[in-house]
Amino acid sequence: MFESNHRRLWLGGTVLIGAMLGLLIALPWFPMASSGKTVQLEFLRSEPDQALLFFGFPGCGEICPIAMERLHAIKSNGGFPIPIQVGLVNIAVDLPAFTVSEYAHSFDPEFAGYHLDQGKLRSLAQDLGLNLPATEGGISTSFSHPDALFLLQHVEDESWRLKQIFSATRLTRQQLLKSL
């Protein structure tokens, strides 16, 4: 009797500790910006007035290909119900600017790639509550980064309002339709 109770307590404690560690490890990757926040995005066109922004890099071996393929699949299978800009913001600032553009176009010719300098990238990530690890000195293909996909709406001039944050690797067309 004592042994079975002890074993249950041990298993329960192990599960609880594992869940807490998982949360502590994953928490920094979750964006903390709330919808309604306004950010300055001088690199986006004012039309169409809706945009989906994803942060990643060419050569990513895990998250980026899945996210970009998912966006392409949603666009190809029924499309977006309204015109939307889809952009990939490069987090590997040491790569040449044309590389991110070519990478985005490889998934869909209408997808755009944006290469910001380190200061603008950090500022934008901070505005959106995105915790990006330091990337100086290059990024390996096994580098893990958040899969946050930001839905934004143009307000005026270079101002965009954050409408919704999605998981880019798990986004469905239905989720997107509900938010537009």
Language model region names:
Residues 42-45, 78, 140-142:
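Short secondary-structure boundary/capping segments
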